[in-house]
Each structure stands twice: as structure tokens, then as C-alpha cells.
Amino acid sequence: MALTKQLIIEALAGRLIVSAQAYPGEPMRDSRTMAQVAASAVRGGAAAVRVQGIADIQAVRAAVEVPVIGLWKDGNAGVYITPTYQHAYAVALAGAHVVAVDGTRRPRPDGLSLEQTITRIHENTNALVMADCGSLDDALAAAKAGADFLGTTLAGYTEERPKTTGPDLELLRTMIEADVRIPVIAEGRIHTPSQASDAIRAGAHAVVVGTAITHPTTITSWFVDAMEV
């Protein structure tokens, strides 16, 4: 059965999305490994997975039956999360049900506006679009541009908001209170079950957790740091 927009929205409502990503040079930087991590997360109850890179998206699509949110990080500064339409098209072709893109108001490398990018994705693929935002103004602009989902992903990573220690629940609430009429997904620095629960209580449609579940190097460092007395 094809996953329609409404089915995906319903599948994510009040649920956990697990982000499975490893970075170049890390021991787990392997597409088969990421597929196994994603499958393990689904077995634990994840309603969807968020995956970076074409090879990983393809491997994860073959390993799980839940919605896959795909992205392509190109670089590590500025607009680098699925920064152009060509990146987005490749992510959709790899099998992503939802393409996550930089949803800020910053200039995009290919010169297209966010609205033009989203329109082309909708016209040329069956994928939905998640706009990773850094501020309320980003969210309002992304909603107007035609995004299917809004995320707090880039809160604290642009100049518009300070980087909070935990999730930016203030931004989450303001996005929801703005009545954008689009599902708002909480993402970014959600490190504990209680923080995920707080995000749902604040009105998030769904919650993305990555590092705290799928990045052993960072999780181990938290324990090591806490034990230093």
C-alpha cells in the first residue's frame, strides 16, 4: 500500500522518529550498519526513521516498512541539509517518503527559493517535504512555501536564536501557536525520554531523537564526563 500524505501524518502523530546517522571516519559509518540501527529502532517502537545520504536511504528503505525521512548533508556550514533541488530529487529517488531540506530563509546554493524547491519536489516526485527551521519566521515562510512538515531542527544553529542546552521548547510552542496548520515536529538536542514527553505535551506532532539513541560515541562520552570527580 502506498504511503499517502494523510497516512504518513497519521502514522507519525504523537510518535517517535529515530534519526540514524553516523559521520565520516566513525566506526559505524556503513550503510548496512545504519540499516541495522534503523531496523532496531523500529523494533523498539519508532514510527519512522530519519536517514542521511543516498546509500543509507536505499539500505534503510530495504530494511524497514515505516516512513523514511531522507536528507543529504553536503558540507557542514550554512545551507547544507539537502541544499539544492538536485540533492532533494536524488533523496526522493533513493526512496525517501519525506525529503528533509534546509527550511531557513537563507540563500540556497542553486539560487532557487525554498518555494521553488518545494514546488519542484512535489511536481517531480511523490515525496513530501519537511522544512528544517531555525526560527518562527523560517517556519512561517516554509509553511507559505508549501512544506508538508515543519521541524525545529535548526534552532540554535542560525543567528536568529541562541543554542539551548536541551530542546528549544519555546520555539516549538511559538510555531504551534502561530497556527501554521502544518504538523510541527520537534527535533534537536532531545536527549532524554522526559524531554521527548515534554515536546509532545507542548504540542509537537512527533519527536525526532538521534544522538541519544543511535550515536554510541556521544552517549559513552556523557557517562565518562559524568563520572569525572
Regions found by a protein language model. Name each.
Residues 41, 60, 91, 142, ...:
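Conserved, mostly hydrophobic/aromatic
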Residues 13-18, 63-77, 117-134, 177-187:
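Short beta-strand/loop segments at the ligand-binding rim of alpha/beta enzyme cores
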Residues 1-28:
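N-terminal amphipathic alpha-helix/helix-capping segment at the start of soluble metabolic enzymes
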Residues 52, 184-190, 208-211:
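Glycine-rich beta-strand-to-loop/alpha-helix junction loops that act as flexible
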Residues 2-3, 28-31, 49-69, 78-86, ...:
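Active-site-adjacent beta->alpha loops and helix N-cap segments on the catalytic face
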Residues 44, 63, 94, 124, ...:
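Structural motif
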Residues 37-50, 93-95:
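Catalytic domains of carbohydrate-active enzymes, especially glycoside hydrolases
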Residues 21-23, 43, 94-108, 149-162, ...:
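Glycine-rich phosphate-binding active-site loops on the catalytic face of alpha/beta enzymes
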